[in-house]
């Protein structure tokens, strides 16, 4: 029989489970037995058990992360030092890269191909063997010989892959960049351009730019999400293939850039990106080239390189004397003129885009372009341009334009521009008297002026031959040294900075018009053969211009847009180009810059 509860009001305590460790206290209340709260010894046991369980879970989680890190295509010395967030980021990026690579043409997924059937266990298939040999013996050498770094972006602008050589050129880590957004490492002013190149934003309205790999221009393009996969090979150079080519310049963060070296953006480096857009899996596979260092002293100069010093408007301020070794022009004929005067018409648009990139980013590499010669033809050049500051004045800047001569003169004796035409020199016949004045002159030293009616009786052909031609710089200096002065012809006006037009001097109001135009009704002879004017030149010509320049190409920089469309020209130019002549017959209006 159970022991009755004590009748006293005191408490009784019973130790349960005696002999099996610590006892559990029980409180005996009248008619009810209540368990007492646990003591400090039991709480410590429960905490220890919880800590052991958490430690076991963390150990198992770390083991899984360690095994996952070993599956990443990274060296063991790097994968063992990764934290959990980096392992997750790199794993997700690697899965996206596998999917991105499988949709390529041809696909990159060589490791996914299993061994052929019937292969003995432990032996590798030919595909795996070739892949291993390529990675060990060729892959690293190719990356070292590229003089740049390879990267792949997805449609969101995140790095799916970037080669480890990025640390050589930018000082950034491959692990840090993989899986990160490219917009975190480029200059804020280049975000819109990268969006256009990826097709995530409509291209800005402007003159079309050929999306060529050899061009340094930033070829704008609309979204290519719905564009089908292109099956054409690169050798065919189909329009659809060229539409996916990308070539542009961006400023990326760099820990190797010296402070204050780049006048445009300190801490950034200009990278030339060339690659191809993926249409099926929208993304970009490209190669990033670093541009030569900004100081000219760090750039080795070879025999085929010519250094120019230009203004921000590409006006030649100085050039080396070795330019005469590769061209038929000397420094005296180039200084003071704009580079646009010597660029081939079909290359003017790309040079203009390179000019814009130079002013925006401070450094640029042009594509291959043709530099016109004085006697006809051209030579192929490629230039590296850098905006440099003046050591004496901090606010003044100029352009160092280093040109690589890539070929000898081609198409000699073939005029492609007006300044390449031979000068028309007025030659008087021996039987004729002295030159006739174009207007009545005041009496000099007792002589009387020739009456106007006597002037009409003279041969008009002699008057028609007298056409003012602008003298070359050498001839101009020779005439100044000799002290001779022509009373009938005014001095040649200074050449404007951004226009290049055919200059025939002040045309005289005679019955015989220049270039043999006897009557206004007769068809005008062709000044230039149609073969000398490519279609792009005819497209650049407007009724007020015969040549191209920044003003005619809508270059709307305030410090460049100084001149108008250019002076009006004789009507002999316009029938050749199929353009209406804006002025009256046989006249030429003097305008600003002429």
From Swiss-Prot:
Subcellular location: Nucleus
Result when mutating residue 251 to A: Destabilizes heterodimerization with ARNT. Compromises the transcriptional repression activity of heterodimer ARNT:NPAS1
Keyword list, A-Z: DNA-binding, Nucleus, Repeat, Transcription, Transcription regulation
Domain PAC: 366-409
UniProt tissue specificity: Expressed in brain in inhibitory interneurons. Also found in spinal cord.
Entry GO MF terms: DNA binding; protein heterodimerization activity
Compositional bias annotation for Low complexity: 212-223
Keyword Lipid biosynthesis: no
Pfam family of the protein (one): PAS
GO cellular component: nucleus
SUPFAM superfamilies named among the record's database cross-references: HLH, helix-loop-helix DNA-binding domain, PYP-like sensor domain (PAS domain)
Principal cellular location given in the protein's record: nucleus
Domain bHLH: 45-98
PROSITE patterns according to UniProt: BHLH, PAS
One GO term of the biological process aspect: maternal behavior
Job description of the protein: May control regulatory pathways relevant to schizophrenia and to psychotic illness. May play a role in late central nervous system development by modulating EPO expression in response to cellular oxygen level. Forms a heterodimer that binds core DNA sequence 5'-TACGTG-3' within the hypoxia response element (HRE) leading to transcriptional repression on its target gene TH.
Assembly and oligomerization: Efficient DNA binding requires dimerization with another bHLH protein. Interacts with ARNT; forms a heterodimer that binds core DNA sequence 5'-[AG]CGTG-3' within the hypoxia response element (HRE) leading to a transcriptional repressor on its target gene TH.
NCBIfam families associated with the record: sensory_box
Protein name: Neuronal PAS domain-containing protein 1
């Amino acid at each position: 029989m159970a022991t009755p509860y004590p009748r006293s009001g005191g408490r009784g305590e019973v130790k349960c489970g005696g002999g099996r460790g610590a006892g559990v206290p029980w409180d005996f209340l009248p008619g009810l037995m209540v368990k007492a709260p646990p003591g400090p010894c039991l709480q410590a046991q429960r905490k220890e058990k919880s800590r052991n369980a958490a430690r076991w879970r963390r150990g198992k989680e770390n083991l899984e992360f360690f095994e996952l890190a070993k599956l990443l295509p990274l060296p063991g010395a790097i994968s063992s030092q990764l934290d959990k967030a980096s392992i997750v980021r790199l794993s997700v990026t690697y899965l996206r890269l596998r999917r991105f690579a499988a949709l390529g043409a041809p696909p990159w997924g060589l490791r996914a191909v299993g061994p052929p059937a019937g292969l003995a266990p432990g032996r590798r298939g030919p595909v795996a063997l070739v892949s291993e040999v390529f990675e060990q013996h060729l892959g690293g050498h190719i990356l070292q010989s590229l003089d740049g770094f390879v990267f792949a972006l997805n449609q969101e602008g995140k790095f799916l892959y970037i080669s480890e050589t990025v640390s050589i050129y930018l000082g950034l880590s491959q692990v840090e960049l993989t899986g990160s957004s490219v917009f975190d490492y480029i200059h804020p002013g280049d975000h819109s351009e990268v969006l256009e190149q990826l097709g995530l934003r409509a291209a800005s309205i402007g003159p079309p730019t050929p999306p060529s790999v050899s061009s340094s221009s930033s070829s704008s393009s609309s979204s290519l999400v719905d564009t089908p996969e292109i099956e054409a090979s690169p050798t065919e150079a189909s329009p659809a293939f060229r539409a996916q080519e990308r070539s542009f310049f961006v400023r990326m963060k760099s820990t190797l850039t010296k402070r204050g070296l780049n006048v445009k953006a300190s801490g950034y480096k200009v990278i030339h990106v060339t690659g191809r857009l993926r249409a099926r899996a929208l993304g970009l596979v490209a190669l990033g080239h670093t541009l030569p260092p900004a100081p000219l002293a760090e750039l080795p100069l070879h025999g085929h390189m010519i250094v120019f010093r230009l203004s921000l408007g590409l006006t030649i301020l100085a050039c080396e004397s070795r330019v005469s070794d590769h061209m038929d022009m000397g420094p005296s004929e180039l200084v003071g003129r704009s580079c646009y005067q010597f660029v081939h018409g079909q290359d003017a648009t790309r040079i203009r885009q390179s000019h814009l990139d130079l002013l925006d980013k401070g450094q640029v590499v042009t594509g291959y372009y043709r530099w016109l010669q004085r006697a006809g033809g051209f030579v192929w050049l490629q230039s590296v341009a850098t905006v440099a500051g003046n050591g004496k004045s901090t606010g003044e800047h100029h352009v160092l334009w280093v040109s690589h001569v890539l070929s000898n003169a081609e198409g000699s004796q073939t005029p492609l521009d007006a300044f390449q035409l031979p000068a028309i020199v007025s030659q008087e016949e021996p039987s004729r008297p002295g030159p006739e004045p174009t207007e009545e002159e005041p009496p000099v030293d007792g002589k009387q002026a020739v009456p106007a009616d006597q002037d009409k009786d003279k041969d008009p052909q002699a008057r028609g031959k007298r056409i003012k031609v602008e003298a070359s710089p050498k001839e101009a200096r020779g005439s100044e040294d000799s002290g001779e002065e022509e009373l009938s012809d005014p001095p040649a006006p200074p050449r404007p900075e951004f226009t290049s037009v055919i200059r025939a001097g002040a045309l005289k109001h005679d019955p015989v018009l220049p270039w043999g135009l006897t009557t206004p009704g007769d068809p005008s002879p062709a000044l230039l053969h149609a073969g000398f004017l490519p279609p792009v030149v005819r497209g650049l010509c407007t009724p007020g211009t015969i040549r191209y320049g920044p003003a005619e190409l809508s270059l709307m920089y305030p410090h460049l847009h100084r001149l108008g469309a250019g002076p009006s020209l004789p009507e002999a130019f316009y029938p050749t180009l199929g353009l209406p002549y804006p002025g009256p017959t046989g006249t030429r209006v003097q305008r600003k810059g002429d």
